[in-house]
Amino acid sequence: MSRIGKAPIEIPAGVEVTVEGNLVRVKGPKGELSREIHPAMSITIENGALRVSRPSDEREHKALHGLTRTLIANMVEGVTKGYSKTLELVGTGYRAAKTGNQLTLSVGYSHPVVFNPPPGIEFQVPAPNQVIVAGIDKQLVGQVAADIRATRPPEPYLGKGIKYAGEHIRRKVGKAGK
């Protein structure tokens, strides 16, 4: 069995999981998520834990087993705790501001870059050079954070740009002077 796939998913108090065919719905204190899973995988709920099982030991089924279990575990954690990614703006004059629910970035272009959050995503700006992307869907939080970072990725010579908190930027040596 897949080492990841065979581990049961504990369902915390206040979280409701329903399985209808291929559709898994997870409802918790922070919201509701639903995801369609591969038809080969089967899910059983027994005494407060959810188990994912696979039909055979084929390579594809082994991979889907661990994937399905992890996706459902991420949904359960998302509706209980939520997810967030922190981005840092490094550079002179690089600033972020929240206007309503929009995020406005001044990152060295001739115009400010405006981001509208997709449903389920919230922006927080604790400092002018810091942005927190929060939500219950792990994949969506990561994608929105990656889209924001892509507006001005860190450059290797001065390290200016938008980077994830804790991300190490590989630096290059500039050209040698005479």
UniProtKB/Swiss-Prot annotation:
Signal peptide: none annotated. The keyword Glycoprotein does not apply. GO terms for biological process: cytoplasmic translation. Keywords: Ribonucleoprotein, Ribosomal protein, RNA-binding, rRNA-binding. Pfam families: Ribosomal_L6 (PF00347). InterPro entries: Ribosomal_uL6-like, Ribosomal_uL6-like_a/b-dom_sf, Ribosomal_uL6_a/b-dom, Ribosomal_uL6_bac-type. Gene3D superfamilies: Ribosomal protein L6, alpha-beta domain. Coiled coil: none annotated. One of its GO terms (molecular function) is structural constituent of ribosome. The keyword Transmembrane does not apply. It comes from the Bacteria. GO terms for cellular component: cytosolic large ribosomal subunit. Belongs to the universal ribosomal protein uL6 family. Part of the 50S ribosomal subunit. HAMAP family: Ribosomal_uL6_B (MF_01365_B). NCBIfam families: L6_bact. This protein binds to the 23S rRNA, and is important in its secondary structure. It is located near the subunit interface in the base of the L7/L12 stalk, and near the tRNA binding site of the peptidyltransferase center. This is Large ribosomal subunit protein uL6. The gene is rplF.
